[in-house]
Amino acid sequence: MSKFVPGRRTALIAALLATALQPAVAQAAASKSLKAQAAADVEAQTKQIQVMVDQVFSYAEPGFQEVRTSAYLSDILEKNGFTVTRGVAGIPTAFTATWGSGGPLIALGSDIDDLLGVSQIPGIPNVKPLIEGAPGHGEGHNSGMPLIIAAAIAVKQVMEKNHIPGRLMIWPGVAEELLASKAYYVRAGLFKDVDACIFTHVSNDFSTAYGELGNNGMVSVEYTFHGKTAHAAGMPWEGRSALDAVEIMDTAWNFRREHLPVTQRSHYVITNGGGQPNVVPDRASVWYYFRDRTFAAVKSMYDVGNEISEAAAKATGTTVTHQVLGYAAPNFGNKPLAEAAYANIKAVGMPKWSADDQAFAKAVQENNKRKIAPLSDKVAELSTPENRPQSIGGGSDDIGDIMWTVPTITIRYPSNIPSVIGHNVTAAMAMATPIAHKGVVVGAKAVAMTVLDMMTTPKLLTDAKTYFTDVQLKTDHYAPLLADTDKPAIWLNAKTMAELRPAMEKFYYDPTKYDSYLQQLGIKYPTVTPQ
């Protein structure tokens, strides 16, 4: 046994610690360097980001009809070295774009569809449709995939330069406003080899979240009643009115609504009420969204809806069939991924808003009688189960289907104005302005930096998968209400776009002639008075 010499043990421990810590310190420095490269590569795409955001805004295509949008975005990815597969999961406007080899497979996605009836001239603070009755980006989905594409290109460049193994899969959220694609993506196996997924959604803040997120799950169902025609005045007793059945179902549902959980949300539109009043309608349809907080609660509402439809059919001497048009699982964010992403969000920070940006935001709020709140200069806090207000139900997002398949988070990025109304023209007013462009730039930086964390830190993905299996899957299990015979409702909105597209094409953005879409439309920024 060697003799103990005072000071020698201390020196030995210090030397061992220095040796042990050296790789970690080097890795941290390398990671910081990689992230700086990615941020710079995103910044270098600022002009292309503006063009993409404006271009998709001008296409203004609703769910399943995102033909120009899908082709435009997938072409950009293809030109940047990604392998594109179009028409995945039986959806013509869906695609995957893949790149890389070895290492983990990280999926990145955002939605691309817009909303019916919310056409809006961007960059003005008052309601004024570009085309009366046309669809428009009243949810800001024109900004999400440009963000994802910019982040993916930046990550690809960094990985190539630094010889980092790993793979990317880029995908668009088709028909999110119909909640009608992502469950089919999962069923088709698009995510079976994916290690983790980052999704993005437009907001007026900059943050992410984990745990049960408070979104309702949802099933979208159309009920079609079948009756018998007759002369409505001459021989009404010979008829069996399918429209009567629809009205009885709606009335019965509205009486039942009071006795359902307070977290439920349900709404409907009559999609077919017959032809003309003097013919007893032999066919009529009503389309329902049934929403609630859990898989079981959504199924319970679906079962009640089916029972009421059968009762309405019996009451009217008709028959009924129903078809599932879409599904969305409740949302659940992954804690390790959210914490990693939030560190990057804080590192990136909010955009540097100009006086013009603040003036336009205030003008939108004032002219539409909304609460006055400036564009924020601070990132929001990380949303956790402990600091989130208790949810009593609300909207849905079919990213939930992917969240229950692989570890997933949603990053909210600041491309819109506080206080605007969702699914409304006020939410479209800023979406082709510098406010939207700047929010996409910072969002793309945070996404790119988080992807690099996943590619270079195996423990992050291990922890994410452990949380997914040991925490998330202990709370519930994925149980979509899709039958094997259910197919994506790709016919939806086709008739609307066939009628409107010729007029809309005249307003598509031409970046070869105009620096911005606002310039093409003759809008001076900021316009703060009604036009």
Enumerate the language-model features and the residues they cover:
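Bacterial N-terminal signal peptides that target proteins for export
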Residues: M1-I13
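Acidic/His- and Gly-rich active-site-bordering loop/insert found
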Residues: A29-H137, N142, P146-R167
